[in-house]
């Protein structure tokens, strides 16, 4: 019987693409006096392309933008600081996120978060979505000194939740960091489908977060 569900944040609970798109349009407007010679749609599109679904850190993204568009009145530090400060104001959850977390809570299912990233930045995003009010534990890679898919970060979460691996689901969008990473310690991995990862195949897949509820009755014997 499942007693706990662990979640990734970006691309799983947080609709990162929509959030980032909203943020970069707003950032362009804030710095328009420096960017007025660049079409807004072109600048925003190039930012999203360079971002590479979050796997290129923003200092590199901004350095490339400044170089490509020959922007000399802004620094990458200014833009990065603006990103770190203001992204939280544009966080958009995936559909049914709150309903899922509420229903898990009502069923006395423990809830945890394991996310790679910088602690303050990720905690601000979790608070922006009000996720922290549902969770029993939150592990951010910077604070833990270890990141997914290392098995230790999953084992720490199990210990904090006081559940066995076979009593826990892990829901995430990254095939290796989330699904296969959690399964290497015996957790039941669930893939939150993301077209960015192409044709990854798995026996447990959800497109809508509420579909996670269908896995709560899985018995240990189904893993053998």
Regions from the PLM with identified roles:
Residues 60, 85-111, 151:
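Short, acidic loop-to-helix structural element flanking the phosphoryl-transfer center
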Residues 41, 59, 95-98, 166, ...:
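Residues in well-ordered alpha-helical elements
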Residues 2-95:
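N-terminal helical cap/lid subdomain that shapes the substrate entry/recognition surface
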Residues 1-5, 102-105, 110, 114, ...:
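Asp-based, Mg2+/Mn2+-dependent phosphohydrolase catalytic module
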């Amino acid at each position: 019987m499942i007693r706990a569900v662990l979640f990734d944040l970006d691309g799983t609970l947080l609709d990162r693409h929509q959030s980032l798109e909203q943020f970069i349009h707003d950032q362009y407007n804030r710095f328009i006096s420096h960017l007025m010679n660049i079409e807004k749609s072109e600048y925003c599109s190039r930012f999203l392309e360079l971002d590479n679904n979050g796997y290129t850190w923003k200092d590199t993204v901004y350095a490339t933008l400044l170089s490509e568009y020959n922007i000399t009145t802004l620094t990458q530090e200014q833009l990065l600081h603006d990103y770190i400060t203001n992204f939280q104001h544009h966080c958009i959850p995936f559909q049914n996120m709150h309903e899922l977390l509420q229903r898990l809570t009502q069923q006395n299912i423990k809830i945890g978060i394991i996310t790679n990233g910088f602690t303050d930045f990720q905690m601000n995003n979790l608070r922006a979505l009000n996720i922290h009010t549902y969770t029993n534990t939150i592990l951010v890679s910077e604070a833990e000194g270890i990141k997914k898919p290392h098995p230790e970060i999953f084992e720490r979460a199990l210990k904090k939740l006081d559940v066995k691996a076979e009593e826990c689901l892990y829901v995430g969008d990254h095939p290796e960091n989330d699904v296969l990473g959690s399964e290497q310690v015996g957790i039941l991995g669930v893939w939150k489908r993301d077209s960015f990862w192409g044709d990854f195949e798995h026996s447990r897949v959800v497109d809508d977060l509420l579909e996670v509820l269908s896995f709560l009755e899985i018995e240990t014997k189904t893993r053998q």
